[in-house]
Amino acid sequence: MAVISMKQLLEAGVHFGHQTRRWNPKMAKYIFTERNGIHVIDLQQTVKYADQAYDFMRDAAANDAVVLFVGTKKQAADAVAEEAVRSGQYFINHRWLGGTLTNWGTIQKRIARLKEIKRMEEDGTFEVLPKKEVALLNKQRARLEKFLGGIEDMPRIPDVMYVVDPHKEQIAVKEAKKLGIPVVAMVDTNTDPDDIDVIIPANDDAIRAVKLITAKLADAIIEGRQGEDAVAVEAEFAASETQADSIEEIVEVVEGDNA
């Protein structure tokens, strides 16, 4: 049984790609048709590739892989943080700092500084410092937490990276590839899929689509670490009585949405 149904994908808008003029020809094989100037992603392929991504992530987690979730645009930020935390992993959901992976030593120093500032507040050091200095420290902490809070406790460079919109996160993908870190990604019709190891053809601009795919991969991690019975299934994504099983039904839905 597929880990994500056709109906779930349709309801989340996973099938809507970009305007045809913005497409990347390398995504042609993942596109079913075009409607009103918008490419429609072939959801039968999305179902297949989502299954493969789920298996990949589950198996990686079963081998104690460290997974980094990356999604810095507003449509992805909340889901990336929530699902990374739920699955006991790590995330970056604000601007990717160049060298986050390839200059990990420097990043670790900044993380150490963040932890030092937190300790200063907890042990009472703030109480004996001038207010102006405390204000500066709080400002520094806020900035460090914004960019590094999601990887503050990451024990090492990740074994796997999951990316929402690799077109936007090109620097992150390049760093991962340089270090030999496999990349799992939601890939829209405007993206070059060549640098992605495990592709999920999908609309990466809709909040519900991002949430659906990201939550399912978090489920895979939980299953890999704790077993299938431990997977927490989101109620809104639970299988319903009806299924959209054919490409023809997808086209009917798309045409209806664009009518």
Swiss-Prot record:
NCBIfam families: rpsB_bact. GO terms for biological process: translation. The keyword NAD does not apply. The gene is rpsB. This is Small ribosomal subunit protein uS2. It comes from the Bacteria. PANTHER family: 30S RIBOSOMAL PROTEIN S2 PROKARYOTIC AND ORGANELLAR, SMALL RIBOSOMAL SUBUNIT PROTEIN US2M. Pfam families: Ribosomal_S2. GO terms for cellular component: cytosolic small ribosomal subunit. One of its GO terms (molecular function) is structural constituent of ribosome. Belongs to the universal ribosomal protein uS2 family. InterPro entries: Ribosomal_uS2 (IPR001865), Ribosomal_uS2_bac/mit/plastid (IPR005706), Ribosomal_uS2_CS (IPR018130), Ribosomal_uS2_flav_dom_sf (IPR023591).
